[in-house]
Regions:
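Serine residues within intrinsically disordered or low-complexity segments
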Residues: 4, 9, 22, 27-29, ...
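Bacterial N-terminal signal peptides that target proteins for export
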Residues: 28-51
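Acidic, metal/ion-coordinating pockets
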Residues: 40, 62-377, 381, 435-447, ...
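Bacterial N-terminal signal peptides
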Residues: 50-59
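Catalytic centers of hydrolytic enzymes
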Residues: 76-79, 88-89, 95, 103-105, ...
Length: 620
């Protein structure tokens, strides 16, 4: 059963009010019955009776789980499918991932819920567009068209929703005539579901942004249950996209914003509230949702869940970090499902038919999208595998949607002609993307320095979005690695300033600095991290040396915090082209074969530092 959208007045939410609402919500939540009940099924393949303990206002009691026939009369199931960080990954690769396959899985789930009187809710947690030619050549239009057909109920606005900037080829405004959010607003206007942004604040009004079809929250009807959905984005949003496209915006704290908006939704009649949060975490084991030992305990979405008053938010669809989550934190189910259209998350909310409130929940591991599966392990199998069987889900074979394929076809055809263009170069060994120093990261930095003719290049590991396979270089492969339309910038740093920039990055989490033209050795001394720099020929860089540095407009504007230790930046020049285009031109003129061993070995690192990031020098 599809969720049907329902118009509502969101109420006035000021930034000042969001910060002050926590105590009010905490007291109100005591009056919300039935929201603190939790049930986890320990093993879905060996169902057995479980004991459910219900905490109510005046007394606690325990009862045996109802029989299936009684459950059918008294409860219904709302299955929530959560996606995030599609990044334009609309297509399957070798029978894995893509929106046509997602539609096949969702159709099977909808059929299952229709048969038992429940419903399905499809929610996205942001970063829908940026990342592939299929999406970027039309500024995300193809993603919205496919999401409309899939029947999404809502999508959060993530940091990369701002990447396209104004409508047209430029990624940032050229002048006052350009709306820095033009492309985002156009995509929202095309959507048959709302874009949610409760904590993205217009500084001129101190209220959440109110662009056409962009709002803090929505209420939808799922099998007769009024479900509220609140959208929020990571506190790092403004430093994780183009600064020119977020001028005049602020990000309100996530937990107070969620609490305030969820309370308003309940006052407006929602009996279930879900958060769609472009904020994430990382877990690696999914057998037991209550076991958090494989999860990073201090991750943003876990801090948010623990800060929420009990019973205000029933569940969270998370994203941003590109990792899996299928866990319960502070009594709240949280799911997240990697990136690039690889998988989806799911939790089932068991809802009392009379009260409309959640009585229990089930959390499912991230589900990979597969056309075929291994008959023994049921894991995804290659299409070419002779023993693979068609995948099944909810007791039915999964069939990729021909309707979705037809929607994607024009964008796929347009991208194909661009992707196939050969460049004058070859990659000898597969190069993998990581958030540590890598051969691929060093190669991208080398390309950027060579293209700009600079002394040094500074890039960021977060800007590298795909592995680079062995074989001939094509524009499509280069584009997959560097999909952002960041402009090539040059600026001047002294040796002392560059040392400061590198030391700062090594002492923080997040995107790693990528360098070309110098090698940095860092060591702790007297409680400080001290960095020594050498030029590639071996000469030490002095504090007063002036270096011409190639970088991107994203980093020059403070992105990822890499260049923020130096302010103001000097001699900044826009070189008039996109970084990727400059690299492609240079490869075409100076092409050769690149080997991994030339770019990184244990003895030939560009960043040498004690331990792991973030480096701490105050430890004994």
């Amino acid at each position: 059963m599809y969720a049907s959208a329902e118009r509502r007045s969101p109420g006035r939410t000021t930034l000042r009010h969001v910060w002050a609402v926590s105590d009010i919500v905490r007291s109100m939540s005591r009056a919300v019955p039935g929201l603190l009940i939790t049930m986890l099924e320990e093993h879905r393949r060996t169902p057995r009776p479980v004991v459910v303990c219900a905490l109510v206002l005046t007394a606690a009691s325990c009862a045996r789980q109802s029989t299936p026939s009684a459950d059918r009369r008294s409860t219904l199931t709302v299955s929530v499918v959560g996606t995030s960080d599609l990044h334009g990954g609309v297509l399957a690769e070798d029978g894995r991932g893509g929106l046509a396959l997602l539609d096949g899985y969702v159709r099977n789930l909808r059929a299952a819920r229709q048969s038992d009187g429940g419903g399905v809710l499809l929610v996205d947690a942001g970063d829908m567009f940026q990342g592939t030619l299929e999406s970027n050549l039309n500024e995300g239009q193809v993603v919205v068209a496919a999401y409309n057909a899939l029947g999404y109920a809502a999508a959060a606005v993530g940091n990369h929703e701002f990447d396209y900037g104004p409508i047209g080829d430029r990624a940032t405004p050229a002048g006052p005539q350009d709306d820095p959010r033009g492309a985002l607003k156009s995509r929202a206007a095309e959507a048959r579901f709302p874009f949610l942004a409760a904590n993205i604040i217009d500084e001129s009004t101190e209220m959440p942004v109110r662009w056409p079809n962009v709002q803090p929250s929505t209420i939808v009807d799922v099998a007769g249950v009024r479900v509220g959905i609140v959208g929020v984005t990571t506190s790092a949003t403004l430093s994780a996209t183009m600064a020119a496209n977020t001028v005049g915006l602020a990000i309100a704290p996530l937990a107070p914003t969620l609490a305030a908006e969820a309370t308003r939704l309940r006052a407006s009649g929602a009996t279930v509230v879900i958060a769609s949060a472009h904020a994430g975490g990382r877990c690696t084991a999914f057998e037991n949702p209550s076991d958090l030992s494989s999860c990073g305990g201090d991750e943003e979405i876990f801090r948010v869940a623990r800060a929420l008053p009990g019973g205000v938010v029933d569940a969270i669809v998370a994203g941003h970090r590109h990792f899996g989550i299928a866990h319960e934190v502070a009594g709240i189910p949280i799911v997240s499902s990697y990136s690039g259209g690889r998988a989806f998350g799911r939790f089932d909310l068991i809802v009392d038919r009379q009260t409309g409130r959640v009585t229990s929940h089930r959390i499912f591991p991230p589900r990979d999208l597969c056309a075929t599966q291994d008959p023994a392990t049921r894991a995804c199998a290659r299409l070419s595998s002779g023993t693979a069987l068609p995948s099944d889900y909810e007791g039915r074979p999964v069939a990729a949607s021909a309707d979705i394929d037809r929607i994607l076809a024009p964008a796929v055809e347009r991208a194909r002609s661009v992707k196939g263009r050969r460049l004058n170069g070859r990659i000898a060994d597969p190069l993998r993307r990581t958030n540590e120093e890598s051969a691929l990261g060093n190669l991208v930095a080398d390309w950027a320095r060579a293209a700009a003719g600079a002394d040094v290049a500074i890039a960021n590991s977060g800007g590298i979005r795909a592995d680079l396979p062995a074989g001939p270089l094509t524009f499509g492969r280069l584009y997959a690695v560097t999909p952002f339309d960041n402009r090539e910038m040059t600026l001047t740093l002294t040796g002392e300033e560059l040392r400061r920039v590198i030391a700062n990055n090594l002492q923080h989490r997040g995107s790693l600095i990528l360098i070309s033209g110098v090698r940095a050795t860092a060591a702790c001394g007297s409680g400080e991290l001290r960095v020594t720099l050498r030029r590639d020929p071996g000469r030490t860089v002095t504090d007063t040396d002036r270096l011409r540095v190639a970088t991107s407009d994203f980093l020059a504007a403070g992105g990822d915090g890499i260049l923020t230790p130096v302010s103001p930046l000097r001699d900044v020049k826009d070189e008039g082209r996109v970084v990727r285009d400059g690299i492609a031109d240079w490869i075409q003129r100076h092409g050769r074969t690149w080997r991994a061993a030339e770019l990184l070995t244990a003895e030939n690192r560009r960043l040498t530092f004690p331990g792991t990031r973030p480096v701490r020098c105050d430890r004994p």
